[in-house]
Amino acid sequence: VERTLFSKEEREMRKLAPLFLVVLALALVQCAPPSTPAPEPTSPPVEEPEDTPVPEPTATEEPAPTEEPAEQVLRIAFDASDLSSLDPHFAAATQDRAIVDMVFNGLIRYKPGDISQFEPDLAKAIPDPTTEDDKQVWTFELREGVMCHPWNGNEGYELTAEDVIYSLEKAANADRSAYAGEYTGMTFEAPDDYTVRVILDQPLSPALFLPKVTDYAGGFVVCKQAAEDLGDEAFKTHPVGTGPFMFESYTPMEMVRLAANEQYFRGAPKLTTVEAHYIPDISSRELGLREGELDLAEGLREQPWIEKMTGAEGVTVDVFGPGETVVLHMNQSVDPLGDVNVRRAIAYTLAREDFLAFFGEDTADALYSPVPVEFLAGGLTMEEVGEAGVIYETDRAMAQELLAEAGAEELELTANTSERASYRRTYEAIQDQLKQVGITLNLEVVDHSTMHSLIREDANPLVVYIAWRPNADVFLTRFYHSDSIVVTGAKPDTNFSHYTQIDDLIEGARVETDPDRQAELWKEAQLKIMEDAAAYPLFILKFVFGRAEYVDFGYDLMSTLALYPQITENTQLTR
């Protein structure tokens, strides 16, 4: 069923409403009795000033009504049925991270539109680390006068170091954050209201440390009083931060409405309201863009859709990076995937070129290692993977031999896939390819947030995961360190393969101060992953959004970690 914001009849009524009001106003003026002027006194008393009668205005004398400034309401639609969590320390899906990005800040931030540059955010400046008692210390001086949003009748209040410490400790708590593993070996101090110290047991390079305190994942700062007052569960649907937009309302399976934060420390936003709509049907999102009922909409990350919408009147298609890695993780705790021959058989069955052909040249690039070499230090090139003998060029005869050796010739698996096209179509392509060697993959389509919950409950033997992380350490720690194994890990995260063989390499690289040696350790870890066929890197998928031409982001969009074209205080509608 198509979902649009307004029906045709509603749109016609909206067009006629202003004319109806004008006619009604004129009718009331003509029907009103004439005013009776008070008699003018000969000598007006001081205590009673002259009451000058006001004549009834004629049609030619009636002043033109004063127009109030038009509200700037931006309507964005996501490929999702509903939100999952707006607690920034749990937000993972596109529709959640987008809202979180508008509501919260970090100590520092990625420059909007360009992830290659850091900027101060809640902090006044980006510090250099110092050493105290053989420990690395990062000291942040906070901006003064930054206000937390009001909530549930409570007034906003000034954010201080107490809020930042509370937020970092929450991010480091596995019971209250999906990103706790990022903060192992850190302690946090507040010497005064505007100073925050982060103390590390093991030193980290700026490239590894700074992303942990940015406007990303666990680095988002929540307001302590609001979080404690609402409680963790309510906070998931009523976020309170310091960002340019503040939470106003949530209608399940329909919309989140945000209002401009007039007290935002960078200045009041140019938009008055942002409406984030949940519309999983691509036809409805397209129609909304074409008919002007949506201003921004998540598109299909596929070449035909880009070409179709590029030709739509008044619509611009934004394709931007860095994109996300698309990787197939194979759960070794599930028989027969515990047998490396079965995992290698699956790898030999898959054909990267088929995925690239399906998604298209504008959106997809081949991926040969868990860490993408095009963007991050420590990634592996196609040549390096090939020389190591772990590229797994498509060889379905070899795949069938390996399955026979493992006694898994008639293997049948069931996996849950998101309704989102990027997930569903990737799973369907894998399903078709596995069928060529006798493997049956049954797919259950669920809404996006449910899929995220199920795979974290270890429900899938095969997990397609689409993600970006800021550096090789985060990629390897969160997907392949034993602490990150879903459900059973010390700090469960996204190790869907239950892989345990590279902890020492990950930890050694993390504290290595020589960048070249650090990259070598990361590469060694990935070659081991590939040798053991714990995961199979498929491709990199860029972001695609359709935008009305009158939407001005207020910055040049090249890349973002927020998974959508960021809406900032400078975003506006120019129509």
Could you tell me what each predicted segment is?
Residues 75, 160-166, 193-199, 243-244, ...:
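Alpha-helical secondary-structure segments
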Residues 233, 261-307, 431, 440:
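Ligand-site clamp/hinge motif
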Residues 77-131, 169, 240-242:
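N-terminal lobe/hinge region of extracytoplasmic solute-binding protein
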Residues 125-176, 197, 288, 336-338:
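Aromatic- and charge-enriched surface segment that lines or borders ligand/interaction sites
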Residues 251, 349-380, 419-432, 453-575:
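Detector for C-terminal structural segments
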Residues 111-113, 204, 212-269, 273, ...:
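Gly/Pro-rich hinge or "lid" segments in bacterial periplasmic/extracellular proteins
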Residues 26-68, 574-575:
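Ser/Thr-rich, Proline-interspersed low-complexity disordered segments
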Residues 141, 176-226:
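Surface-exposed binding/hinge segments that line
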